[in-house]
Swiss-Prot record:
This is Odorant receptor 67a. Residues 62-79, 166-208, 301-314, 402-407 are extracellular. It comes from Drosophila melanogaster. Interacts with Orco. Complexes exist early in the endomembrane system in olfactory sensory neurons (OSNs), coupling these complexes to the conserved ciliary trafficking pathway. GO terms for cellular component: dendrite membrane; plasma membrane. The lineage of its organism: Eukaryota, Metazoa, Ecdysozoa, Arthropoda, Hexapoda. Keywords: Cell membrane, Membrane, Olfaction, Receptor, Sensory transduction, Transducer, Transmembrane, Transmembrane helix. Pfam families: 7tm_6. Residues 1-40, 101-144, 230-278, 332-378 are cytoplasmic.
Amino acid sequence: MDNVAEMPEEKYVEVDDFLRLAVKFYNTLGIDPYETGRKRTIWFQIYFALNMFNMVFSFYAEVATLVDRLRDNENFLESCILLSYVSFVVMGLSKIGAVMKKKPKMTALVRQLETCFPSPSAKVQEEYAVKSWLKRCHIYTKGFGGLFMIMYFAHALIPLFIYFIQRVLLHYPDAKQIMPFYQLEPWEFRDSWLFYPSYFHQSSAGYTATCGSIAGDLMIFAVVLQVIMHYERLAKVLREFKIQAHNAPNGAKEDIRKLQSLVANHIDILRLTDLMNEVFGIPLLLNFIASALLVCLVGVQLTIALSPEYFCKQMLFLISVLLEVYLLCSFSQRLIDASENVGHAAYDMDWLGSDKRFKKILIFISMRSQKPVCLKATVVLDLSMPTMSIFLGMSYKFFCAVRTMYQ
């Protein structure tokens, strides 16, 4: 008999495909952001505990160094650099703490995403354009994550690289051993083998803070893109809705049945949005406060004479923070536009020949769409592109105040 080659089964997109990169960053810290049914070993929990201990220890050492430098009025620049690092660590710690505290809510959010996600069918997933949305998700998440990792490695490796060149290649007798983030430790590390373990512990703490910040943002991007996907599909179906009231005996009832299923879908998306804001609200608020302070402090540093390596590191820092805030505002604006588009689609559809009950349901859809949804930093702030202008204005005011103090 001839051997018949089996056709490989087509792999359909799942919710995990959107969340995979964010989950990987969390896993490198020893964190499962939501319940997966996979039982972790005790070593995974020990790894998380060691990461947190190292990060908290570094945070207190960094604060102690900052206090010591603030006592010396001549070290204003170093104080600004240290304060920017402290702000970044606080942002990373707050995001890690938020995801640990909100883990049950995060699990509920992922389960809701899985419930609403298109079924594993080529026709259904094509209707939602799932592959196209996944491609966009990968572009944003990989690009953003890559930029932050470049920023981290620039801060973590440049001091060691400079020391290696001066000591090994140029044979400078007075080559200084400089730590990546702060220069005060409870032990003496200079001209000692303790320099390398100390350097590793600071670099590891920086990685934890960076990954904590990255993972939270990537999770937000992945969830928001899926919600926008659902809104876009709903608007498309409404626009292409074919009224059957005058074309079939039970056409009016069939029209109402189909529209009711779309209304139920709309309600599910709205619930998904509410749950998303409940999970990410506090991290978004803390993110904006810390980012405004970071932009201010790094901006001040760039206006002062800096060495080339410091300038490059801080420029990467500034670009990363500004891009983070811009993307959050941009995604929220797209969410606003997509939710409003549902109301426009309800008006644009061919509803003139429909039943009266059908028209009443359409009115409710349009009325609900007049209140667009967006990312909410708790009740304090609704994110949108105008929020970016507010953020830049607030950062500039901080910048002017700090610059005046320096002068």
